[in-house]
């Protein structure tokens, strides 16, 4: 094409220069000025890498003054174009705009504009864009979206709770699984789902100070959620950046003490518009009707302002009824306002639990039982389901399951309370107790005797506590530097045990930090044993370092010496040997100690070693725990109740361990009480809750579905293709691990999630669980999501040209592959992607408008095509521009039908699902007061907004490929 002064051209290789103007032409060269950057370029006339910019009727163009015009006619005179049309701002028609006055900052965003302007992408980028659209759409439609990306084992009961709660609007629930069943992971899964779907954006986690760092690391390592830890220092810093310091971060962790200490700080927390509040160790919030604690009041105030609340707590039996009611009251004060009424309700759950047990047993039901079930469910037309459940047909089992679901929906706190027990969850190790009876040294005997004389006025409780720790009595008289460890037989036994088990990791727990520090020194100096220490005097980072050193396999510490605080919230299930150097004062603390090793996922039986001194409170307590409560070898939900009931007698025996008369009877009575309470707990409400929380076959099927997805080879192929195109180096390290590092030729200079030093990744869940240094890559990992965003939010791969070598077709035959996207714009919290994620519609048109896409599959077709360089491609486009325009118009005429079908299907699905959920909850509202009014209102509002957004759904051309047939 001849060059003329004033013509507008665009550079094929430097499209960022914008629109160029021909300012000089001679026999061999042409000079273009690019006004938007002020740069000149000199090109050879014969084969210059530039493309003539020509607009067509229907296009919208912008003048250098900023006003826009819809083109209706194009005139050419002496090689220069004049566009005639209607101005969009004044609606003036017949306006002429010469091409020299076009806006130089012109950006070609439509695929066809980019193609005609010579902005042609590599063929592999077009293929990647289509795959990104296709896979992205498929992932949004997965029923377990949000549950696959976490680095956790696929444990059915955890997945069941997360799947149920994570999909709710502003969930307000109590997670009260027994110790070791993974409440933190359940909470993380719920957060991950809510954040990924857009249901929540701002999250506040409040935990005891000792657990802050653990939550921070756990959320990042397992769920790729980067929380900010707020303490006094961080809060003061953030005050310089915003009126409300908490507005500076979306995801925040702080301690309960930090939140409670300052009135202004609590007000700032309440005003920060969180979507979700998570409170760990919620059983520490003390409440009574007359005097709730300040901690309880602080959380109560926050819970009034935050729509979604997750409370993590000990089991209801351990708490006692009043304390349990107090947690539920935080979640829904309107529903749980009267403690006496709550107690009465709980008594009425026995018949429901019996009915559920009856259905699950599979026995034939009598007419009376059928009538009772009908009355309990209170639904019309329930008769056929009852008959099916009582028949021998194939549908009997599913009918019984449906009736169980209905019963649980309608009765009790199953919507707000989740509680799994070890009885209902398989996969726990055995616990084996080894008691080591040791003689009481004369030094201790003397100290105890003197202490008894001098402390005669002490209360029985104080004397009992003293008698548990004889080394402290000795130090009271001999001074803090008294070397009790030189004669205490427990120390000698511990050193012998550790030296004979050098290959074993051993957790040693004692009540006081001073004991742990003194033991570390003795072990190091006498036997060269590597021991890490973990106590309340250390900073969080120091504790983390100690825990990490203990976790290291080859060069790590053999022993971790913990004070009592070390047994709250920290998990060391890679170890299976525990030594209790002394015993805690109550059964809850004992269970907490053992719970650090006894967790789901523990591979070995747990060996619990208790060296104790005879004729001390230790010898009394070891018998009471083991023979009276069976608390060492099994979890003991009855412990707190029995402890409270025999407290005074037990204290007297502990204070005077020599006086054992009647102690055998006490143990016998406690054991009988324990067995009776245990039997009682296994009936009634607990059974109902357990069935609901566990999820049964449904939860198992969910875990299996996700496991199948873990083997998705499409992800690996797509990820490697994505990394190649972004410019990320990949180095296979074996053992299913790959090291990714940035290259010098990245699509973007800083890719989110990829550090300068690189990262190690794996696509294998088992490898990710074993290797903390490897990131677990799934469709939900930020690296993949950021990659999808990078490709799909820009124009990468949106226009390309390929050659098809096929002698069955005439040379020069044109095909145009069009990728349309059908989508609806809506706020993220509506979660419209459940029904209509941005969905690609592929068309492959010839010049007559025949759509060959159904006959010619994308990947097969893509392998038959050859790439064209950009310069040759521009020439081809110019030669067939009018034909391509005509095919595009045929495509526009055809897409409407396909797009409308997708939109209608999405509307029907949304209407059906959201209306069904609303109807179900409205029906249940009549019989189950645990359904909140605001939840019903939110679902109805959500349904209306979703339907309105789907009514506004549309489609657009996202990418196109021009294919030219050749025989060479």
Swiss-Prot record:
Q: What does this protein do?
A: Transcription regulator that activates transcription by stimulating RNA polymerase (RNAP) recycling in case of stress conditions such as supercoiled DNA or high salt concentrations. Probably acts by releasing the RNAP, when it is trapped or immobilized on tightly supercoiled DNA. Does not activate transcription on linear DNA. Probably not involved in DNA repair.
> Could you tell me what this protein is called?
RNA polymerase-associated protein RapA
Q: Name one GO molecular function term.
A: hydrolase activity, acting on acid anhydrides
Query: Per its UniProt entry, what is the enzyme's top EC class, as one word?
Result: hydrolase
- The coding gene here is rapA
Residues reported to bind ATP: 177-184
Which residue windows are coiled coil? none
Task: Write down the EC number.
Answer: 3.6.4.-
Sorted UniProt keywords: Activator, ATP-binding, DNA-binding, Helicase, Hydrolase, Nucleotide-binding, Transcription, Transcription regulation
Please indicate if the UniProt record lists Iron-sulfur as a keyword.
no
SMART domains linked to this entry = DEXDc (SM00487), HELICc (SM00490)
Swiss-Prot/TrEMBL GO biological process terms = regulation of DNA-templated transcription
**Gene3D superfamilies hit by this protein:** 2.30.30.140, 2.30.30.930, 3.30.360.80, 6.10.140.1500, 6.10.140.2230, P-loop containing nucleotide triphosphate hydrolases, Tandem AAA-ATPase domain
This protein's species is Escherichia coli O6:H1 (strain CFT073 / ATCC 700928 / UPEC)
Domain Helicase ATP-binding stretches: 164-334
Domain of life assignment: Bacteria
Any one Pfam family here would be Tudor_RapA
Q: Matching PANTHER family, A to Z?
A: DNA ANNEALING HELICASE AND ENDONUCLEASE ZRANB3 FAMILY MEMBER, SWI_SNF-RELATED MATRIX-ASSOCIATED ACTIN-DEPENDENT REGULATOR OF CHROMATIN SUBFAMILY A-LIKE PROTEIN 1
Where the record places motif DEAH box is 280-283
**What does the subunit comment say?**
Interacts with the RNAP. Has a higher affinity for the core RNAP than for the holoenzyme. Its ATPase activity is stimulated by binding to RNAP.
Q: Which CDD domains match?
A: DEXDc_RapA, SF2_C_SNF
Instruction: Report the residue ranges that make up the Helicase C-terminal domain in this protein.
Output: 490-662
Name the protein family.
Answer: Belongs to the SNF2/RAD54 helicase family. RapA subfamily.
């Amino acid at each position: 094409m001849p060059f003329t002064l004033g013509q507008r051209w665009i550079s094929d290789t430097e499209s960022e220069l914008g629109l160029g103007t021909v300012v000089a032409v001679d026999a061999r060269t042409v000079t273009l000025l690019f006004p938007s950057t002020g740069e000149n370029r000199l090109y050879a006339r014969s084969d210059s890498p530039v493309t003539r910019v020509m607009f067509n009727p229907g296009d919208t163009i912008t003048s250098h003054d900023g006003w826009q015009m819809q083109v209706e006619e194009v005139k050419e005179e002496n090689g220069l174009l004049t566009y005639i049309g209607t101005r969009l701002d004044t609606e003036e028609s017949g306006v002429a705009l010469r091409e020299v006055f076009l806006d130089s900052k012109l950006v070609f965003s439509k695929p066809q504009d980019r193609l005609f302007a010579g902005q042609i992408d590599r063929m592999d980028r077009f293929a990647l864009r289509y795959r990104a659209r296709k896979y992205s759409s498929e992932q949004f439609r997965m029923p377990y979206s949000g549950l696959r990306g976490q680095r956790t084992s696929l444990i059915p009961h955890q997945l069941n709770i997360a799947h149920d709660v994570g999909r709710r609007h502003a969930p307000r629930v109590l997670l009260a699984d027994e110790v070791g069943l993974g409440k933190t992971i359940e909470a993380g899964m719920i957060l991950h789902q809510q954040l990924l779907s857009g249901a929540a954006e701002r999250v506040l986690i409040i935990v005891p100070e000792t657990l802050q760092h653990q939550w921070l690391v756990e959320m990042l390592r397992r769920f790729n959620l980067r929380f900010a830890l707020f303490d006094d220092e961080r809060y003061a810093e953030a005050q310089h950046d915003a009126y409300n310091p908490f507005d500076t971060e979306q995801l925040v962790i702080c301690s309960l003490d930090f939140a409670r200490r300052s009135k202004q700080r609590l007000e700032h927390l309440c005003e920060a518009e969180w979507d979700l509040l998570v409170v760990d160790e919620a059983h520490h919030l003390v409440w009574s009707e007359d005097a709730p604690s300040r901690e309880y009041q602080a959380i109560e105030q926050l819970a009034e302002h935050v729509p979604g609340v997750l409370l993590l707590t000990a089991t209801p039996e351990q708490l006692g009824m009043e304390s349990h009611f107090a947690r539920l009251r935080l979640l829904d004060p309107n529903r749980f306002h009267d403690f006496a009424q709550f107690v009465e309700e709980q008594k009425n759950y026995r018949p429901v639990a019996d009915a559920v047990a009856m259905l699950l047993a599979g026995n034939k039901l009598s007419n009376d039982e059928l009538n009772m079930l009908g009355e309990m469910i209170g639904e019309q037309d329930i008769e056929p389901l009852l008959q099916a459940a009582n028949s021998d047909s194939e549908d009997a089992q599913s009918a019984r399951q449906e009736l169980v679901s209905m019963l649980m929906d309608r009765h009790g706190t199953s919507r707000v309370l989740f509680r799994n027990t070890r009885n209902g969850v398989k996969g726990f190790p055995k616990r084996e107790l080894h008691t080591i009876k040791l003689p009481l040294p004369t030094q201790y005997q003397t100290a105890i005797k003197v202490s008894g004389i001098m402390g005669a006025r002490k209360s029985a409780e104080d004397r009992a506590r003293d008698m548990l720790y004889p080394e402290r009595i000795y130090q009271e008289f001999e001074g803090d530097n008294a070397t009790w460890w030189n004669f205490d037989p427990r120390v000698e036994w511990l050193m012998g045990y550790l030296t004979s088990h050098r290959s074993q990791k051993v957790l040693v727990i004692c009540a006081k930090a001073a004991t742990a520090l003194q033991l570390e020194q003795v072990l190091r100096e006498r036997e060269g044993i590597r021991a890490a220490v973990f106590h309340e005097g250390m900073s969080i980072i120091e504790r983390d370092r100690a825990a990490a050193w203990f976790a290291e396999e080859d060069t790590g510490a053999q022993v971790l010496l913990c004070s009592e605080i070390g047994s709250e919230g920290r998990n060391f299930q890679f170890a299976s040997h525990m030594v209790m150097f002394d015993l805690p004062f109550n059964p809850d603390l004992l269970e907490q100690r053992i719970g650090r090793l006894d967790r789901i996922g523990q591979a070995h039986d747990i060996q619990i070693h208790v060296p104790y001194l005879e004729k001390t409170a230790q010898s009394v307590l070891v018998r009471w725990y083991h023979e009276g409560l069976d608390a060492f070898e099994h979890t003991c939900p009855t412990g707190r109740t029995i402890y409270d009931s025999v407290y005074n007698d037990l204290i007297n025996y502990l204070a005077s361990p020599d006086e054992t008369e009647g102690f055998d009877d006490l143990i016998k009575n406690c054991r009988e009480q324990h067995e009776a309470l245990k039997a009682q707990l296994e009936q009634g409400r607990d059974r109902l809750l357990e069935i609901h929380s566990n999820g049964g076959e449904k939860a198992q099927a969910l875990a299996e579905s996700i496991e199948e997805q873990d083997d998705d080879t499409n992800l690996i192929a797509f990820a490697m293709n994505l990394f190649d195109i972004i410019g990320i180096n990949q180095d296979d390290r074996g053992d299913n691990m790959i090291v990714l590092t940035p290259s010098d030729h990245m699509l973007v200079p800083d890719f989110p999630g990829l550090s300068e030093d690189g990262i190690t990744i794996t696509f294998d869940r088992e490898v990710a669980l074993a290797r903390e240094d490897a990131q677990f890559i799934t469709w939900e990992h930020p690296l993949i999501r950021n990659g999808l965003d990078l490709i799909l939010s820009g124009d990468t791969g949106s226009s390309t040209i390929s050659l098809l070598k096929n002698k069955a077709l005439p040379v020069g035959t044109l095909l145009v592959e069009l990728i349309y996207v059908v989508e609806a714009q809506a706020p993220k919290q509506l979660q419209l992607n459940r029904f209509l994620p941005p969905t690609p519609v592929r068309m492959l048109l010839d010049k007559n408008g025949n759509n060959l896409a159904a006959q010619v599959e994308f990947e097969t077709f893509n392998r038959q095509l050859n790439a064209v360089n950009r310069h040759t491609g521009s020439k081809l486009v110019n030669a067939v521009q009018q034909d391509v325009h005509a095919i595009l118009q045929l495509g526009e005429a055809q897409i409407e039908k396909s797009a409308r079908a997708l939109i209608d299907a999405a509307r029907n699905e949304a209407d059906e699902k959201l209306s069904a959920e609303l109807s179900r909850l409205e029906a249940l509202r009549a019989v189950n007061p645990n359904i909140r009014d605001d939840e019903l209102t939110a679902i109805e509002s959500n349904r209306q907004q979703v339907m309105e957004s789907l009514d506004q759904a549309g489609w657009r051309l996202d990418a196109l490929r021009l294919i030219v047939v050749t025989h060479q």
